[in-house]
Amino acid sequence: MVNCVVKNWQGDEVGQTSLELKVAKEETASHILHRAVVRHLANARQGNASTKTRAEVRGGGRKPWRQKGTGRARAGSNRSPLWRGGGVIFGPKPRDYSQKMNRKERRLALRTALNSKAENLIIVENFAPELPQPKTKELALALTRWGVTEKDKVLLILSEIPENISLSARNICNVKLIRADSINVYDILSASKLVATSDALAKILEVYSD
């Protein structure tokens, strides 16, 4: 169990909360996290790269020159893979790159990733009322008060994403917004700081804690 300090909009400590998650064993943690990251990246691939074989390329039906007597290398088609404009040998075709992972493993990987970032997890009160209108500067200053530096890559986790917060955060470098029910291992591990609202943390614990 990890105890986390809760901060308000001004950056003052207003309470504490605990992060209690069942995580993978130390000897298997890196393996299950690796599988989850590879799965996430593989599932994001479109897999629509496509090339044409010599059978699919337009043209090439006529023999370029006769078999013998010209002194040139024999050729049966000007769409051979050896020719410019010819087909591609063993080129990519549309395919599905998606990988499967058991639900229990996915949840365990996510809990393990969250727990590994506990030292860099910042819990804040719901700050939507503090931004009635989109204000990028105000949100950037709040992140600084919460202990985030310009070099940090931040994952901002909210239970819901109001439009005013979305518009305020979209022009801040290295800040990514995500809903609590959409978090994934890749985004958690790639961030140097996690900033989550109390509501978002409660939702995460409700959904993912075993």
UniProtKB/Swiss-Prot annotation:
UniProt record similarity statement: Belongs to the universal ribosomal protein uL4 family.
Organism: Gloeothece citriformis (strain PCC 7424)
Any one GO CC term of the record: ribosome
Pfam families per the UniProt record, alphabetical: Ribosomal_L4
Region annotated Disordered, chain positions: 46-96
Subunit structure, as described in the record: Part of the 50S ribosomal subunit.
NCBIfam families found in the cross-reference section: rplD_bact
Xref: InterPro entries: Ribosomal_uL4, Ribosomal_uL4-like, Ribosomal_uL4_dom_sf
Keyword list, A-Z: Ribonucleoprotein, Ribosomal protein, RNA-binding, rRNA-binding
Task of the protein: One of the primary rRNA binding proteins, this protein initially binds near the 5'-end of the 23S rRNA. It is important during the early stages of 50S assembly. It makes multiple contacts with different domains of the 23S rRNA in the assembled 50S subunit and ribosome. Forms part of the polypeptide exit tunnel.
Bias-annotated ranges (Basic residues): 60-71
This protein's name: Large ribosomal subunit protein uL4
GO MF: rRNA binding; structural constituent of ribosome
Lineage top rank: taxon: Bacteria
One BP term from GO: translation
